[in-house]
């Protein structure tokens, strides 16, 4: 498929599609377009960059009017409330109470504002529904619940904010300046084998939608080789397919381990593209039309039931009609109920194929940019933080393993945001969607060539920005940015004179190594102490008449104690959450190796199922999905890469506190190897304490 063209700050957006798009993925038009049996048009979604979304919401209110935003609500059943109150459902008095309050079932518990919902009307909305001011100045909310808009035919548009769109736009902007070319996403080779090879290896840290543990475990099994494979990949790891037990059948069929079968010949043409396994909401509609004789309007009612947050009850109401229709078409009741059960799984958030296709486009674009323009991509995703699955430290460690040169924070070169440095000495600074070259540097003129293949290699490094340092607030940012507009700092004293910061902020800068380059005459292990000493002197305050400042001579100066390598790593992690001087695990690797503890890379290379192993690393991710039947999943990171850990429910109950709170773990267990996917099934857990800053790591915990 042909990707759409994107220019910087394009009003069309990254996921804009042309007129051929529905034909490419066989979209079900009834899902959005009105027909005789529909009482509503249905919500329309429009993606926007995260930073641009507020502009678009304001623009929509300015153009369309303040009276076109909508509200949403949460529901709660009466029985659920009784159980929360500790009441016995078998008590006659409680049952009588439940009967009395049954009419309150699913009424709103409280109201909340829909994140990005806008309503379009032909006439002033206030003449149709009641309005009220929102808590945010300048915003107005419709008092109706969003699902109440359908009966009166009001159109709701959702503005969706995606941080990854900001990353893509900024990355394209950086490339245009660092490589002197313009990347046109509409001209990308969507069959680039090198990009698919990367995804098949699950080398996808920082790639949109396919960077999670579950996606990384699926990619080597699915082995995507074309765009539609990515559409399937995006939709596969969702609650609907998982709870409907469709993931493993699809993967087994794709690998040739299970024959491709269909519930009934009448639905073969619907399920052929997903190997006989229903994955998309649109397929549920198409199956109802083909097998049960539903009209497009009836199929849309089914879709609405599948996608509704209270869809189980609505699905039960339509169940008998669906099964009866299939039986009228000669499908046995047992087969009909099996088909219905598969469709019913989508009541738990089956993914629309149209959404999956739009997401898959961003998946491929981000994988392509990361593969061919890793420095620019890293800079863009770091400047877009917080977002995504991994911390800046993990993103940087992964980029370094892929050959990206990352330079430390340096107040003679760094600004607030992360920047790019070229081998010829030029520095590209980025801020809020704009770029500028460093002071007294000549800016190259882009030749605007449309790029279909990567250009000749040019060395580009990422310079970390001051924003990474913990303890600096928005005031520090404003003051630092204003001062750096007039040139870099030349010394600690020069910086203190030009910028107004409190003493704590200056200490943070010194302890993070931001002044190290100003003390090049000192050994590397003493530079931070020298900087801290000078910062304390420069920020001491005005000279007092009875206590004049006396600068000691070189002979009088006492030698400052040196940082050990472990202390440097600890200081880095404490101040920034990462260290370019070395991963904490590297400091204890010789000791661990003597005790048979493997690196993440060694565990992957062994690849022998059932082999006992021991691994250790920083816990960068903890997950306990509701669809995993109590299993807990960890991701450990060491100096060579990452390894995934699987913990059974009983093991987790035994060691829950240790697993949930310890930043550095040594785990013994057995390897699980299936279709090139390597996990460790954990049996024993032990906390490690290095004093190397591991306690300052912020992981992705149970989200």
Region spans (language model):
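Noncatalytic, beta-rich nucleic-acid-contacting surfaces in large DNA/RNA-processing enzymes
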Residues: 1-703
């Amino acid at each position: 498929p042909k990707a759409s063209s994107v220019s910087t700050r394009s009003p069309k957006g990254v996921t804009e599609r042309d007129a051929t798009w529905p034909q490419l993925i066989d979209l079900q038009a009834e899902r959005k377009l009105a027909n005789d049996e529909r009482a509503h048009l249905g919500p329309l979604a429009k993606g926007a960059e995260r930073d641009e979304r507020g502009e678009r919401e304001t623009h929509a209110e300015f153009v369309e009017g303040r009276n076109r935003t909508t509200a949403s609500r949460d529901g709660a059943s009466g029985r659920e409330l009784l159980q929360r109150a500790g009441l016995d459902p078998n008590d006659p008095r409680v049952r009588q109470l439940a009967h009395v309050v049954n009419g309150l079932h699913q009424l709103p518990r409280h109201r909340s504002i829909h994140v990005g919902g806008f309503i379009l009307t032909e006439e002033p909305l206030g003449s149709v529904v009641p309005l009220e001011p929102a808590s945010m100045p300048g915003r107005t909310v419709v008092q109706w619940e969003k699902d109440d808009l359908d009966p009166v035919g009001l159109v709701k548009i959702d503005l969706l904010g995606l941080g990854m769109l900001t990353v893509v736009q900024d990355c394209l902007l950086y490339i245009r300046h660092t490589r002197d070319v313009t990347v046109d996403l509409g001209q990308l080779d969507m069959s680039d084998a090198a990009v698919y090879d990367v995804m098949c290896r699950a080398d996808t840290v920082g790639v949109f939608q396919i960077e999670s543990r579950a996606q990384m475990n699926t990619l080597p099994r699915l082995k995507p080789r074309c765009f539609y494979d990515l559409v399937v990949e995006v939709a596969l790891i969702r609650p609907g397919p998982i709870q409907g037990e469709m993931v493993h059948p699809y993967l087994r069929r794709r690998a040739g381990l299970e024959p491709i079968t269909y519930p009934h010949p009448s639905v073969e043409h619907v399920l052929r593209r997903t190997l006989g396994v229903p994955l998309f909401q649109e397929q549920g509609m198409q199956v109802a039309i083909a097998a049960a004789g539903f009209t497009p309007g009836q199929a849309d009612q089914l879709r609405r039931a599948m996608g509704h947050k209270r869809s189980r009850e609505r699905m039960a109401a339509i169940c008998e009609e669906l099964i009866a229709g299939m039986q009228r078409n000669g499908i046995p009741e047992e087969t009909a109920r099996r088909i219905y059960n598969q469709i019913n799984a989508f009541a738990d958030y089956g993914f629309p194929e149209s959404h999956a296709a739009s997401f898959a486009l961003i998946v491929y674009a981000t994988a392509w940019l990361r593969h061919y323009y890793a420095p620019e991509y890293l800079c863009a995703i770091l400047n877009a933080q917080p977002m995504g699955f991994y911390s800046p430290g993990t993103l940087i460690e992964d980029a370094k393993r892929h050959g990206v040169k990352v330079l430390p924070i340096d107040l003679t070169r760094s600004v607030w945001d992360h920047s790019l440095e070229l081998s010829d000495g030029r520095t590209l600074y980025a801020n809020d969607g704009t770029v500028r070259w460093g002071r007294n540097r000549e800016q190259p003129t882009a030749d605007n060539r449309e790029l279909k293949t990567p250009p000749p290699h040019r060395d580009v490094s990422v310079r970390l920005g001051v924003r990474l340092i913990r303890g600096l607030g928005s005031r520090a940012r404003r003051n630092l940015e204003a001062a750096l507009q007039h040139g870099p700092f030349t010394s600690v004293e020069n910086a203190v004179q030009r910028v107004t910061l409190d003493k704590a902020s200056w200490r943070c800068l010194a302890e993070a190594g931001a002044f190290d380059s100003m003390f090049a005459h000192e050994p590397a292990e003493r530079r931070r102490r020298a900087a801290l000493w000078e910062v304390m002197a420069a920020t001491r305050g005005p000279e007092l008449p009875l206590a004049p400042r006396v600068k000691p001579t070189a002979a009088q100066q006492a030698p400052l104690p040196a940082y050990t390598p472990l202390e440097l790593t600890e200081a880095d992690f404490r101040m920034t959450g990462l260290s370019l001087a070395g991963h904490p695990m590297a400091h204890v690797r010789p000791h661990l190796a003597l005790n048979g503890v493997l690196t993440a890379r060694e565990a992957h290379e062994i690849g022998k199922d059932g082999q006992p192993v021991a691994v250790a690393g920083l816990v960068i991710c903890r997950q306990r999905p509701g669809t995993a039947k109590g299993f807990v999943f960890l991701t450990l990171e060491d100096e060579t890469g990452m390894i995934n850990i699987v913990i059974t429910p009983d093991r987790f109950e035994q060691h829950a506190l240790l697993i949930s709170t310890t930043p550095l773990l040594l785990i013994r267990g057995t390897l699980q190897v299936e279709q090139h996917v390597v996990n460790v099934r954990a049996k024993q857990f032990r906390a490690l304490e290095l004093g190397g800053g591991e306690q300052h790591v912020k992981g992705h915990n149970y989200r």
